[in-house]
């Protein structure tokens, strides 16, 4: 209830600050019998890891995850899985200059007022470094979903600043440092990032997350609709300011005759709904889009105040991404996977007895 | 966990189908000592109620709510509050024609596949009629927030189809049937609705919800951020396909130097963030936008299938809104109020000891 | 979280005061496809109902339960089930004499101090009248457990005051007003009750609850062990002051060589454990005992204080049971059934994939 | 929901197996501003630690806890606290002899059937080694309760086998290896343990846990009564088979005139209720008793079966306590402290507005 847990049956609880000793999480409720090693998580951790490309922060973290429990002889046992990543590059530098400073666009001011104290080193708990554990836990969900149910969860960068992709070639996504599915836009992204670096500024981004081969029936009426829970889990990612399911905000100008996805015996004719009807998966691809704000960690000077009630100017030096949206791709995948996994377990908990002869389309 | 509950400390659990005997809800965790009568809820219920204007469905429901428990001598007692609304206009008409039909854009197919059985009368549990109880519960939250903490939660229609409002005059909202804050757009909305009625079609809408006078500090890191929980509660409203906090999807093209809300001793200079930083309320107005899809209950014929695996044509006759977004205004207010109320109680549960001398801006 | 809900996947939330308009509950998470009518609940409600025998309170309540939602054409639909029982015999008598009085052994003082206000009529929310809804919800669980899984949950009175039963004849339990499985003790119980009535006093009781045909595997390590959750649900019944699983407090003087239930290929040789090992059901009968205190609603004068800070004498007149333990028999069954049902759904949520070739004994 | 979490606002989630790499836990919801170091936990960990006395198992574990997050400059920050204890004495011995063996009285059979796989080394997750993290988390709760609210939680051994204590001298408890408050019984306990060691057998025990200076008002009607949640948390301790609140099972033979705790302006005259009325703390001492079964890890040969469906004989060699109840003293304190802490936060979450002029007695 204090917010560091997500999920009901597949539950992930995390801890750890940006410049603390370690990050960790506990996965509770993972089905037993799943083969699992650190390698299964390391791939996605590496995709999210800082310092892997010139486009992202140069902080060097190995992000090596260790499984501390819940796996025996290479298989999950059904008991709680403890995961740990040690922080190796905290750089115990002097933080006295930002100790009292409320950086605009950051959580400094709100954490300070909420708790009275805060770990000001690198944002403490509010740092996006926390998302490493989401990616680790998400990798477990992704493996289970893929291996046992054939469900695949993938994401890509669909827009950065004014540059939008024009096509989706799944093969391209891992071929460039932007998780960009349109090879023709890679240069434009590259150019934009260079420009921003030079100017010491940052830019927002749009990501698209897709889950394919999802069975019909996941999601609970009326508050825990699948789309509501997906909105929750995606909006919980640092910097996300908007979530769309399917056509999202485009529906405002659509007609009902245009939006409804007509059905034939061969399947749905369209997927404006993004794979969710009445809060329950329809069997079509789950499609979501998220908007990530430009980071406020920039060198353009800004006005702010201190915890002592003084005016101040802020410049955030250090190792920061001009576009935090890029590295959010594996995070978005992780969050969607965790939510689908949770709903899959919840669905069969209640409905394992159901037998229906109606054909699924 | 089965989805009919929202909130942790201020918990709302609902039941009821469109054409069942009654709708009801239990509010658990309401602070004691709040003066409360049915009238406090009836105003918002009437705002949501069908049949109150020519622009909305003509189903006639009194929507008279009864308090069954939890209130004694006009005051909440701190124990669970039972609320009931009897369905009076179910019109026990013949539903055999849609019994086997999966209406496109509706939850018919997904409920059927999930549960094996479904109450097909008027959508059963998936009907927006369910939202009446949200409004009733939300009215309790709104009263507490306003009376004890001075927090106000209001919403309005900001777009319908291609027609957007140009200004927000709070006084106007209750002066027209569209909850439109821009008097100059009322005629355009009216015209659009008439056109749609004639064509038997429907249209999407955009709503804006604003909470003012919210204290700094509400929201929990890292998964139960206030924005994540607001996204969840707003996305759980029928027909919502997108949620934005603050600038929402506009952030994609913003620069960090532009988006970050700089702070001065007189307060924040802007509110691009929508009143939430790091998942915690900043003391600025909470601002959210939602996109509602056009209803699929239209008379334009559409293609679909039946539970027996046959092709079929569907035309939805009956008493339906051409724009379901209009009546969603009080619902959106209710959901935001419930979420804020919950977080207010959660915040003080953990942090009641906190004393900070840092000035709030 | 505010306490009026029990269960995770099979969730029961209740409302209602002793002298309010109605009692109600919402069952969320019931599997779909279960045939269910009011009759299925009425039998247990009648067993718990006041006024049915000369041994229990003479308050006359029909306790007629109405299903308001979640059941369609005689079958559960998987959506939330709303239940309602109207209070018909509130007797709007004058309560001004106890309005300010804190009756010893009751919740008057604690509710008053916790909430600042309380519904003093008949104990309000703290009255055992609240348990009617537990019995109704428990009947749904009992039906599902029996019909789909063959699990049976039954209870009996095993001791009242110093009178203990010597044998358990399941056929006898419904043959007498005490739910006593030992026909030879019925007269002694009858005599004890008569004596207490004459003296205006009350007595404690011990109940035994047994679930048979429970599959191996229900219960979650480490905090939500089946025994821990059973202890929770049984201790939540009014007047319960102790819970034992299996041999309970007798284990203090047992040797390990005596207590451990040895296993053979024909099954366990004994059942000291009460059917739970390591918090997980073993496939043996689940056996629990509970101790219920003597009610404080007696006519023997007692010393107390008022909410105004004055000394006072209290005598509780009215329609009260000399032994509240008797009517608790169906309540205990209901609580055990609700807990087993919840764990059954939770177990299959996580472990539906498990295939083991090891024989179950 | 998968069982490795306890509490709602003060939440403790644990992981770790007996012979795994490490044990850990996450405390979520701890109020900020509490001074906290490893030392605050180490004292209780040492009290629970194996190998500290000749009466308990000789496994040597340093049980050194490390704080990984949530504490900054010696103070809790309000964010999740990560704790870790590395297993140092796993003794990677050969477990092939018990790999297929279901030890009677243990969780081997039930875990195997539930999950299909299990970590058989030393009981894996079902080992009481898991309780180290409960003690660590409990120490945080104990410190907060004591320092901020003056609440003290203490426990002692009240019976082992047939030997019962006759008096409670709080000063004595830490003066002997049995946590025995009656100096005159220490020799009898010592003799009993020696005898059992010689015979290779074990014995049960009874513990008493007391919380003093608890404010009136903690606990939630109707399912999350304080006594119900205490029963849950105490019954979740390994080997516990019974829980009593106040007079517990003695109430069966009590009269109402005897049991009800009469009230005067100077306070309650007695405390039969154990400090809880109607599920809510009364301001008196909270008193609970628990019964712990004799461990089945004994050298007396016993009959059992294997996972292959064969008969077998079992003798448990190794480093085991003849009376596991002794070391459960700090565990029982921890569990009661966690539950009180949770309810204290929950209470003020809902009821922080309450002002009552009625004097507390």
UniProtKB/Swiss-Prot annotation, chains A, B, C, D:
Annotated keywords: Amino-acid biosynthesis, Aromatic amino acid biosynthesis, FAD, Flavoprotein, FMN, Lyase, NADP
List of residues binding NADP(+): 48
Pfam assignment, any one: Chorismate_synt
InterPro entries reported for this sequence: Chorismate_synth, Chorismate_synth_AroC_sf, Chorismate_synthase_CS
PROSITE patterns: CHORISMATE_SYNTHASE_1 (PS00787), CHORISMATE_SYNTHASE_2 (PS00788), CHORISMATE_SYNTHASE_3 (PS00789)
NCBIfam families (UniProt xref): aroC, PRK05382.1
Protein name per the record: Chorismate synthase
Record organism: Photobacterium profundum (strain SS9)
Upper lineage: Bacteria, Pseudomonadati, Pseudomonadota, Gammaproteobacteria, Vibrionales
Gene name tied to this protein: aroC
